[in-house]
Regions:
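Nuclease-adjacent, charged terminal/linker segments that flank catalytic cores
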Residues: 1-106
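Generic structural hydrophobic/aromatic packing signal, biased to beta-strands
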Residues: 63, 90-92, 109-111, 182, ...
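Short acidic loop-to-beta-strand element that houses the catalytic metal-binding Asp/Glu
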Residues: 93, 104-113, 123-129
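Short, well-ordered loop/turn elements at secondary-structure boundaries
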Residues: 104-106, 119-121, 188-190
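Protein-protein interaction/assembly regions in multi-subunit complexes
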Residues: 114-118
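Acidic, metal/cofactor-coordinating or nucleic-acid-engaging core segments within structured domains
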Residues: 132-204
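Intrinsically disordered, low-complexity regulatory regions
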Residues: 205-209
Length: 209
């Protein structure tokens, strides 16, 4: 059982002191294909570099960029959207509009299948949903970052506002509205939508029909 909430900081476990992990912490880099080399979570000039937090000793992803590791989610989505021999590429943060031309938000990743001449054959939408946090995760993060070597074994038990995954808000306030609104538009277009979540969050969701 973890005594503190930080599972990964700037892409690495907090007790990983390899040269790569140290470089990412020092320079506040993101190793998971962010749109820029640095972490930009919360604030670009003072990023909250927490990728995942512990719950019961298991890591729970709290940053959507964390899902981009090696772009495995794109491979999985393409296998769901297209035939096995399809050629495809991807675009990130694509604006979605409704029938009136009003913004319906952004699609996290659009996967596009094309033929030998580069003509579009099909596409599908991939949405990524990390888990919201209740409590205050910046306090233990800043405490750790002030002295990673000396505080990698920090004990945060008993601290006020101990950060924990908020599965209910993540599903009701974010995931369900996305499925209804964006999913409704894509359904009318007869296009598929895939949702990437991690296992702990998935296990809290009701069974879908």
């Amino acid at each position: 059982m973890a005594r503190q909430p930080l599972a990964e900081v700037f892409g690495f476990p907090i007790d990983n002191f390899s040269s790569d992990a140290t470089r990412h912490r020092t320079k506040r880099l993101c190793p998971f294909n962010n749109r820029v080399p640095n972490c930009t979570k919360d604030k670009a000039n003072d990023p909250l570099g927490v990728c995942s937090v512990y719950e019961g000793g298991n890591p729970v992803v709290t940053c959507p960029i964390r899902f981009r590791e090696k772009w495995l989610i794109a491979d999985d989505a393409a296998a769901f959207f297209f035939p096995p021999d399809a050629r495809w590429t991807s675009l990130t943060e694509v604006r979605l509009t409704d029938k009136n031309g009003h913004s319906a938000g952004n699609i996290d990743v659009i996967l596009v299948a094309y033929d030998d001449a580069g003509r579009l054959l099909d596409f599908g939408a991939l949405e990524v949903q990390s888990v919201y946090i209740s409590g205050n995760v910046r306090r233990p993060f800043e405490y750790y970052m002030a002295d990673p070597d000396g505080r990698s074994q920090l004990d945060w038990n008993g601290e006020r506002f101990y950060p924990r995954p908020d599965y209910l808000s993540s599903s009701i306030k974010r995931l369900v509205p996305q499925l209804i609104y964006k999913g409704g538009i894509l359904t009318k277009w007869h296009k598929k939508i895939a949702i990437a979540v991690d296992r702990p969050f998935f296990n809290t969701l009701p069974e879908l029909p």
